[in-house]
Amino acid sequence: MNRRRRIYEGKAKILYEGPEPGTLIQFFKDDATAFNKKKHDVIDGKGVLNNRISEYIFTHLNKIGIPTHFIRRLNMREQLIKEVEIIPLEIVVRNVAAGSLSKRLGIEEGTVLPRSIIEFYYKADALDDPMVSEEHITAFGWASPQELDDIMALAIRINDFLSGLFLGVGIQLVDFKIECGRLYEGDMMRIILADEISPDSCRLWDIETKEKMDKDRFRRDMGGLVEAYQEVARRLGIINENEPPRGSGPVLVK
């Protein structure tokens, strides 16, 4: 690992130079962060679960024609991805009031929204990722109007797919965050899904009990994060049904 050239290190992942031009290796760390790194811990086994859950989701998105950077999983913690030019925005899709939306607008957590809402946040840790409007995005050149249309169309399709996927295993998709990038292929450029989709980037509640099965368990000091992520993976059929929840080294289905 040390011999490879490190391209970028974020809060939960490291990007290394890939084996072929136009590819990168995405490594999933066990680091858990919240509130823009103000809260930090290392949780054994988290990266392995996020790698597998994100692989599962991106593979299904690719199959239904939603373009992503995912090529294939390499091992327990790494996947091969296409190199993209990341658009400096976090795109949040909300179906149920929770988190900052509840605080900002005084809406009780758990309130189903009249329709899905798409929000944009400028990726800048020093500024705590401020919420921005479409006007800000186009005025400052972070994305063009056409790119924004493409991003929103992707976000809506991803929301439709994920909502159905999770509903089928007894999980409510409250909200989720995605990132997109520009993929250059010869003279052509298109917007594709990048980063990851995992319980780190989604709010997932058990439909029956409303039990939180996502990173809010870390944000709110609830404990049981790995067990919750394992339960998500188990329901999706990613890890062995008979494997008891435990803090490290989950047995994975090949």
From Swiss-Prot:
InterPro entries: SAICAR_synt/ADE2_N, SAICAR_synt_PurC, SAICAR_synth, SAICAR_synthetase, SAICAR_synthetase_CS. CDD domains: SAICAR_synt_PurC (cd01415). Keywords: ATP-binding, Ligase, Nucleotide-binding, Purine biosynthesis. Its EC number is 6.3.2.6. GO terms for molecular function: ATP binding; phosphoribosylaminoimidazolesuccinocarboxamide synthase activity. GO terms for cellular component: cytosol. One of its GO terms (biological process) is cobalamin biosynthetic process. Transmembrane segments: none annotated. Pathway: Purine metabolism; IMP biosynthesis via de novo pathway; 5-amino-1-(5-phospho-D-ribosyl)imidazole-4-carboxamide from 5-amino-1-(5-phospho-D-ribosyl)imidazole-4-carboxylate: step 1/2. It catalyses: 5-amino-1-(5-phospho-D-ribosyl)imidazole-4-carboxylate + L-aspartate + ATP = (2S)-2-[5-amino-1-(5-phospho-beta-D-ribosyl)imidazole-4-carboxamido]succinate + ADP + phosphate + 2 H(+). It comes from the Bacteria. SUPFAM superfamilies: SAICAR synthase-like. Pfam families: SAICAR_synt. Belongs to the SAICAR synthetase family. This is Phosphoribosylaminoimidazole-succinocarboxamide synthase. It comes from Sinorhizobium medicae (strain WSM419) (Ensifer medicae). The gene is purC.
